[in-house]
Amino acid sequence: MKNEISPKIKCGVAGVGYLGQHHARIYNSLDACDLVGVFDPNEENRLKVSNEQGCDVFNNLEELGEACDVVSVVSPTDLHAEVAIPLMNQGCHLLIEKPLCVSINEAEDILKIAKQNQSIVQVGHI
């Protein structure tokens, strides 16, 4: 049987503060992953992690979503839905840091959009 090489999963991180920098480092260390890049509204954070991990820096969420198959959402909790929904609408699968969001309504919205786009959403407990 012939061994087929699967393409690497194109990963990104939205929010590279304290926890997000660890997501970037871990993706960068996994053979099955290609850390494509990072986005953070704080330019200093995104440039620091981009330089440390040797990946691209994206100036907005839309650019990150276009480049990735999977994105870790590591923004402040009250922004999780605001960050996650557009990424899923771009076809990304997500790892969202705990907690998923701040309300039942936001959770229902995330679930609805995930189903519509056949996006996998996992809540991370790093």
Model-derived regions: residue spans:
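Glycine- and other small-residue-rich loops at beta-strand/loop junctions that grip anionic moieties
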Residues: 16, 73, 99, 124-125
